[in-house]
């Protein structure tokens, strides 16, 4: 099992879909060498250097956290079924209510739509909130996602810029 990186007072909690096999094996989030998460959050301004997966706890120093919708590891996120995502959405709401970060960034549009029973979702800030927590939907940084590094960084930077503009 991969532990959440959470505490009260965070700027943002990044929510992946579920652990891949590399992450399950190492015990660290976004551990597959092809996953661009650590590079993207650095280039977008969330961290002052590119962290390694085994340094994930240092995210708390930057007031960032990580969780996931589904605990079960798979080779690909499309192996997670809708029932698991619905349950994961309910569990995620409880976590966010407990920790109340400024923003929740769900990494994947389809996963967000299924977990929160939403349709026609656009990238970026959502109308739906969890208490005071804004919800953002950002592209998944998996190497299987065809989005370019520049597009990923641009999407994540939009969130960072919005938080900075709010003094967060």
From Swiss-Prot:
Position of the signal peptide: none
GO cellular component assignments: cytoplasm
Record keyword DNA damage present: yes
GO molecular function, one term: pyrimidine-specific mismatch base pair DNA N-glycosylase activity
Subcellular localization(s) per the UniProt record: Cytoplasm
Biological role stated in the UniProt entry: Excises ethenocytosine and uracil, which can arise by alkylation or deamination of cytosine, respectively, from the corresponding mispairs with guanine in ds-DNA. It is capable of hydrolyzing the carbon-nitrogen bond between the sugar-phosphate backbone of the DNA and the mispaired base. The complementary strand guanine functions in substrate recognition. Required for DNA damage lesion repair in stationary-phase cells.
Family, similarity comment: Belongs to the uracil-DNA glycosylase (UDG) superfamily. TDG/mug family.
Subunit structure: Binds DNA as a monomer.
This protein's name: G/U mismatch-specific DNA glycosylase
Organism in which the protein naturally occurs: Cronobacter sakazakii (strain ATCC BAA-894) (Enterobacter sakazakii)
Taxonomic lineage of the native organism: Bacteria, Pseudomonadati, Pseudomonadota, Gammaproteobacteria, Enterobacterales
């Amino acid at each position: 099992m991969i532990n959440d990186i959470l505490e009260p007072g965070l700027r943002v909690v990044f929510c992946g879909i579920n652990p891949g096999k590399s992450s399950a094996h190492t015990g660290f989030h976004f551990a597959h060498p092809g996953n661009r998460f650590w590079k993207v959050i650095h280039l977008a301004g969330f961290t002052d250097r590119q962290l390694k997966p085994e340094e994930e706890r240092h995210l708390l120093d930057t007031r960032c956290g990580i969780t996931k919708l589904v605990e079960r590891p798979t080779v690909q996120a499309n192996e997670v079924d809708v029932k698991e995502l619905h349950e994961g959405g309910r569990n995620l709401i409880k976590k966010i209510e407990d920790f109340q970060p400024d923003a929740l960034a769900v990494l994947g549009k389809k996963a967000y739509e299924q977990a929160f029973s939403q349709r026609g979702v656009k990238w970026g800030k959502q109308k739906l909130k969890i208490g005071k927590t804004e919800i953002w939907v950002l592209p998944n940084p998996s190497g299987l996602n065809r989005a370019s590094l520049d597009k990923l960084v641009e999407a994540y930077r939009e969130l960072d810029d919005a938080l900075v503009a709010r003094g967060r």
